[in-house]
Each structure stands twice: as C-alpha cells, then as structure tokens.
Amino acid sequence: MALLQISEPGMAPAPHQRRLAVGIDLGTTNSLVAAVRNSVPEVLPDEAGRVLLPSVVRYLEKGGRRIGHEAKEQAATDPRNTIVSVKRFMGRGKAEVEGAANAPYEFVDAPGMVQIRTIDGVKSPVEVSAEILATLRYRAEDSLGDDLVGAVITVPAYFDEAQRQATKDAARLAGLNVLRLLNEPTAAAIAYGLDNGSEGLYAVYDLGGGTFDLSILKLTKGVFEVLAAGGDSALGGDDFDHALFGHVLAQAGIDVKTLAPEDVRLLLDRVRVLKEALSSAPQASLDVTLSGGAHLVQTISHDTFASLVEPLVQRTLTPTRKALRDAQVTSADIKGVVLVGGATRMPVIRDAVAKYFGQPPLVNLDPDQVVALGAAIQADLLAGNRGTGDDWLLLDVIPLSLGVETMGGLVEKIIPRNSTIPIARAQEFTTFKDGQTAMAIHVVQGERELVADCRSLARFELRGIPPMTAGAARIRVTYQVDADGLLSVFAREQLSGVEASVVVKPSYGLADDDIAKMLEDSFKTAEIDMRARALREAQVEAERMLEATQAALAADGELLDADERTQVDTLAAALRAVAQGDDTNAIEAATKALAEGTDEFAARRMDKSIKRALSGRRLDEI
C-alpha cells in the first residue's frame, strides 16, 4: 500500500529535498542571480566564471539576439539595436523618456509603455528585461542542476505600481514564478543582518545605475523592520556618466546633436571607463577616435570630476534627510550605513556618506552582489527551505500614501506612506444625494490634500446601491497592499451586499512627476493644502445643506408660515451667495446660521413623520 507523505505547509517532504529558488538583482547596468547552497548564499557565475551579466540586449535580423557581454561589446557599433539601461524605461510612457539623456533609440508612439524600434521589430522594456531574466534563469538551472520553483526579484524601493507590475510581467514572460518583489535596500539589509547578526538602526544607501534608494531599517532579534524609505527613481550612476560626457564634449567644443549614434555610445562607454579609473587614481585620460576621424585626447583630474558631480551627490542627500525625518531619528542614531550598488564605489559618494553620517560606511560585502545575496536568502526561505536560525521576520513599507477621492475633489488617505506591508485598511463612506444608486471610486497616490495634485491609479464604480436618503447608505472601501507592494481595492455596500473591486494596474503611460518631488511638494505646500482642503470641505457642506433645505421645503413647505418661509429663504440665499467664494469662515458661519434657522422646521417635520407612521395603529401594535 502506498503511503502518503505529509509535511508542514510550504516545507519540503524530506529534509534533504530542497526546493530550488533564486534571488535576482535586475539592475540598470548589471544583473545577477544568487542561490543558497549548503546554507550559504552565493552568486552564480556563467560558464566563463563571470557573475555580472551586463543588462544589455542586442537584436539581430530574423529573430536573433545577443545578451550580456557579447551585446555590450557591440553597443558602440550598433547602438540603435542594442538596448542598455532598459530598467530606466520600465513602466514609463513615451513622453517620460523622450528626453532621455543621449539615448540613441527610436521611440515608438504607441499607447501605454514606451516602445523601441529595432531591426527585429518593436520591443517593449518588458520584453527586453525578460531576455535578461531568462538568461539568468538558464544560468541558475544549469548551475543548480534542476528547475526552479521561483525567484525573488529585487526592485528599487521607490518603484511605483506601474514599474513593479512591469517587472512581474517581464518575469512571467521569462518563465519565472515570482515568489516576491523585494525592495533592494531591504535585500541588502537581509544579507548584512543575517551575515553579521547585527541589531540596531541601519541606513541602506543604494545608488545603482539608474535609481537611488535610501532606507532606514531597525534590526531586532531577527525582525527586519523598514522604518522609512526615500529615494529618486531617476537618479543613478548613468547620470554621473552623462555629467562627465557633457564635460568632455564641452572641452572639445562638440555639440552632441552633431554626433552619430555610434559615436554617442562609444563615448559613453569610454567615459564610464574613465569614471571607474578616477575611483582609484588622482587623474585619468581619455583617448578616442570618432567615426568621422575626430581624435579626442583629454586628461581629467579627480577634483574636476568631483566638482562636476557634486549636484548629483547632493541630490542623494535630500531623500536621505527626508527618510531620517520620517523615521523620527537623526544621523547620530544610525549604527551603520550599508552601501549598495556599483556607483557607491566612487570616492565622492563614500566621502559624502561618511561626512553626513559621521562614520565610514560598511563595505565588507561587495556592493554589486549584496542585493542578490539578500534576495537569495529570502527566496530560499519562501521556497520552504527553513533551517535552524531562520526564524526571522521581514517588515517592509510603501513609499507613498494611498487614498480615495471624496466629494469636492478632496483626498481621504486610507493607507499612509511608510506603512508596513502587507497591509489592509478599510473605511466607511456614504452617499451625497438622495436616491443615489451608484458611487464612482477614484484611487489616488500621493501626499497632497487635493486630487488634482496626486497621481491617479485607477477608477471603478459600485452600482446597485439601494435608493436611500443622502447619508443613509454605508459603503465600506478596503485597500489591500500585498507583500510585493501591489494594490487591490474593494468596495461593498453593507445593507445590500453589492460589491466591486479592482486590482490596480496603472497605465504605463502615466506621467511620473518623480515620487521624490511629490513628497517635497507636499512638505512645501502643506499649509496651503490644508487651507484649500478646509475651503472645499466648507463648500461641500454648504452645498449639502442647501440641497437638503430645498428638498425639505419642496416636501413640507406648508409647515412654515409666510414670515418663517421668508426667513429660511433669506438664510439660504445668504449661504448661496458666499458658498462659491474663498472665505472659509464666512461659508461656515452662513452654513451654521441656516442650520440653526431651520431647527424648528426640522422638528415639525419629525413630528409630522411620527404622526404619519402612527396613524391608524393601535397601542398594542406599537
């Protein structure tokens, strides 16, 4: 008789049967894949022993393609068909990347996410990223000798809903089961925390090729709690390359518009080598011949480079200050600063971090590999390979508040920013007008008080609400954010049970006003926003009062004598006169006057309703 194998949920049936899962760092410049072997996380190399896979894809005629090192070598000779730094285009519309610095690509005007025309047809960033992910998947399966049950893929903490969804789509296209989308700084903290048994407050400074993240984490007895996250989703090592690129052209008196695409790519590649050389030498030289025969020879000192990129360095410190403020800590409270991303190898970055935090940063793990290692540890745990000492908890956060539009274009925040995920929050709303049978629900993201100043994520309608007087219906709206940071919204009318929901998958074409800028604007305009909100709330209440009064007069106007009717009409006219103005106090005073002036009328209506309800009924029936 066959025996059933019974094991704990999510655990392997036998201790020696490990379920293979990997951590993937899908980077702007380079990507890596790592796995846990013999309880130790390690980065998996290719057949040549290289662990870094350049995030570059070159498309050839008739469906051919080259990925990684081979594609990177051809970037200068075939720039239009060789896609580099594709992560910067993930989840973005054409309007957002049209001005991408010195990009040699032909962007296609199509709805949704930006498309790039190549010799093999039009490609989306999702397709390009899928090629990179598939290459890493094959590397892992060859190295581990079996199929994967899934992968943890890291994303910048400041990736928005569209960018996260695009990353999951790319993984699915590559044949990968996504166990979790993990924020890059959190992955780095896992690698450091589990490796060193650290406890206390830590800052993770993550400067990659195209994005910057700063997270404040609290490590306590196996609990990884993200207290706050900040960053800039459009700032990375590429921007340092472009600053140096612009300086080289200016010194040579060359206008970038006169350069052929292959020369732009060649110069950018040489400038990147120059930047890397300046990380370990006081000066470095550039010697390059362009396609037209022009020969450029320049020597640049480290001091010159440092002055060129100082504005970029300062841009990383602005989100750093905000994250510390959000976490309600100071730089002096930070026990250690973890550096993540190849761009943090630059001395200008390490010096700036050391000066700001008053201590040298932690660099005992390779900044290029630490994110992949942390992701591998999380993947191994999620695959069910729990071992001794693996009892730890990860608490991540969302970067921006999630809210719903209410009457008057106001935002009611349901889940505030820096809330720990996964999370679900619910709030009850009601109807504004008598007999209202439907409600439009508008989901927004941002810190401002007015809908017009926030990002629209989704809209849906709840229909079938039973007709009732205004304010009688009870609609419960629930926001649910999963561990990947993706949002679902549910609405339910409590009496009838009708419900509607939406999984938020925002249009890839939405303009990203830069999440960091949204936060900055919210701080600068907080007082103005609150005044505007108070005004709109007063106007909405005035409108509700006027509509209710008008409906009452139409139904029971005979309960008032001529003088009383004149008084109510006068108060209503006074409120109507100020309701659309900008004097909040005047609107509130006029609303209060009308409410008090109709108190007796309301009492008479109540008496009439009671008499009508009791008419013709015996005492024992009541």
Swiss-Prot record:
GO terms for biological process: iron-sulfur cluster assembly. The keyword Signal does not apply. Keywords: ATP-binding, Chaperone, Nucleotide-binding. Gene3D superfamilies: 1.20.1270.10, 3.30.420.40, Actin, Chain A, domain 4, Substrate Binding Domain Of DNAk, Chain A, domain 1. The keyword Lyase does not apply. InterPro entries: ATPase_NBD, Heat_shock_70_CS, HscA_NBD, HSP70_C_sf, HSP70_peptide-bd_sf, Hsp_70_fam, ISC_FeS_clus_asmbl_HscA. CDD domains: ASKHA_NBD_HSP70_HscA. GO terms for molecular function: ATP binding; ATP hydrolysis activity; ATP-dependent protein folding chaperone; unfolded protein binding. PROSITE patterns: HSP70_1, HSP70_2, HSP70_3. Signal peptide: none annotated. Pfam families: HSP70 (PF00012). Belongs to the heat shock protein 70 family. Chaperone involved in the maturation of iron-sulfur cluster-containing proteins. Has a low intrinsic ATPase activity which is markedly stimulated by HscB. This is Chaperone protein HscA homolog.
